[in-house]
């Protein structure tokens, strides 16, 4: 099976809970290699650009407000079948439906403040990685 890359966000509510290290440890325990990561505080323009596909939906403004309410941690993760394995680790988007032991079951506060984001396809992963990471900011792991 081919090695894939996926994109992950630790959202403002999870950053505020000081669980970044715990989430990274769970990524690594699940066999992911972290090949790029940074902390940043999204501007309104960045949040609107990243979530542009949701523009016009009833939850869009609240999502932008939440995602700009504090710092986030964006990461590029690498493993076999990375997109699906990462989504399985995150759990259901709605934490009320997330299985015990998933990141959203453990760290989400609500549907909007669900703690984490993960790419839903390889195409989304490529687009999302390119949104946050420039040339040379993702480092292939050779060891």
Swiss-Prot record:
It is an enzyme of class 2 (transferase). Its cofactor is Mg(2+). The keyword Metal-binding applies. GO terms for biological process: CTP biosynthetic process; GTP biosynthetic process; purine nucleotide metabolic process; pyrimidine nucleotide metabolic process; UTP biosynthetic process. One of its GO terms (cellular component) is cytoplasm. ATP binds at residues 11, 59, 87, 93, 104, 114. PROSITE patterns: NDPK, NDPK_LIKE. The keyword Metal-binding applies. The active site is at 117 (pros-phosphohistidine intermediate). It is found in: Cytoplasm. It catalyses: a 2'-deoxyribonucleoside 5'-diphosphate + ATP = a 2'-deoxyribonucleoside 5'-triphosphate + ADP; a ribonucleoside 5'-diphosphate + ATP = a ribonucleoside 5'-triphosphate + ADP. It holds the Pfam family NDK. Its main location: cytoplasm. GO terms for molecular function: ATP binding; metal ion binding; nucleoside diphosphate kinase activity. Keywords: ATP-binding, Cytoplasm, Kinase, Magnesium, Metal-binding, Nucleotide metabolism, Nucleotide-binding, Phosphoprotein, Transferase. Its EC number is 2.7.4.6. Homotetramer. Major role in the synthesis of nucleoside triphosphates other than ATP. The ATP gamma phosphate is transferred to the NDP beta phosphate via a ping-pong mechanism, using a phosphorylated active-site intermediate. Belongs to the NDK family. This is Nucleoside diphosphate kinase. It comes from Salmonella typhimurium (strain LT2 / SGSC1412 / ATCC 700720). The gene is ndk.
């Amino acid at each position: 099976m081919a090695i894939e890359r996926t994109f992950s966000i630790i959202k403002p509510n999870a950053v505020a809970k000081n669980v970044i290290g715990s989430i990274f440890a769970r990524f690594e325990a699940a066999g992911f290699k972290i090949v790029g990561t940074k902390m940043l505080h999204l501007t309104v323009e960045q949040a609107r650009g990243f979530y542009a596909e949701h523009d016009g939906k009833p939850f869009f403004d609240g999502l932008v407000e939440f995602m700009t309410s504090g710092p986030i941690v964006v990461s590029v993760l690498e493993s076999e079948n990375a997109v699906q394995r990462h989504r399985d680790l995150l759990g259901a988007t709605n934490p009320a439906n997330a299985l015990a032991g998933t990141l959203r079951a453990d760290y989400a506060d609500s549907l909007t403040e669900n703690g984490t984001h993960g790419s839903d396809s390889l195409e989304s992963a490529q687009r999302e990685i390119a949104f946050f990471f420039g040339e040379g900011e993702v480092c292939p792991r050779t060891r």
